[in-house]
Amino acid sequence: MTLNKQQLTLNCDMGESFGSWKMGADDSVMPHVDMANIACGFHASDPNVMHDTITLANLHDVDIGAHPGYPDLQGFGRRSLSMSSDEITNMVIYQVGALQALCRAQYTDIGYIKPHGALYNDMMKSDAVFRAVVKAAALFKVPLMILASQENEKYLEIADDYDVPLLFEAFADRLYQDDGMLTPRRHPNAVLKDELAILEQVRTLADSGRVKTASGSYILLEADTICVHGDNEESIALIQKIRQSLYSGGN
């Protein structure tokens, strides 16, 4: 089988358990994705979970990405913290360095960085935060995954100052605004629930590089990868359908 013309990959946040607390269904999801965004201990995860998730990714030949977030276990990294640019850079280096060390222990490496939660959102809203994260990615010489939007060129120009490649991601199950940004989760319908709507969004992205917005308009969205979520049996089945759709071109 061959991927469609844009060769979109699937990425998923993983390794977000902590001690005896379990989150997600990584064992079931990993065989169906191309890239695993592994939590690095600040918003979720711990050294043992990180190790086990790396092992699982290696088993299924899945690219490993570092998924750093704000130091906020209780809030799952979804609350913004006021930090200086240097603090953000060092915070990201600290987390990515931990995951990279655990990767090296298994003779592998991280392939990219994708910030989590509020850090991801802040990075897309603030050029200063974006630069702080890019500086960390430059140290590890890996691409940075960010939200595909109408401002891709702006972010490419900033990242180019540090020789950091960018990976642009779209979301299978999120409602978009006309400016290409995600509808905030506090709004109703921000997360798509209907399976057919999610599959249609993925197919439209893959076939034409467009996405339907909350206003009913279509906008261009240049993406390299699609983020999926695998929290339960229903979502795992949906990931399988999304992957099949990408490989079959929707047939």
Curated annotation (Swiss-Prot):
It catalyses: 5-oxo-L-proline + ATP + 2 H2O = L-glutamate + ADP + phosphate + H(+). It comes from the Bacteria. The gene is pxpA. Transmembrane segments: none annotated. Gene3D superfamilies: Glycoside hydrolase/deacetylase. The lineage of its organism: Bacteria, Pseudomonadati, Pseudomonadota, Gammaproteobacteria, Vibrionales. Belongs to the LamB/PxpA family. GO terms for molecular function: 5-oxoprolinase (ATP-hydrolyzing) activity; ATP binding. It is an enzyme of class 3 (hydrolase). Coiled coil: none annotated. Keywords: ATP-binding, Hydrolase, Nucleotide-binding. This is 5-oxoprolinase subunit A.
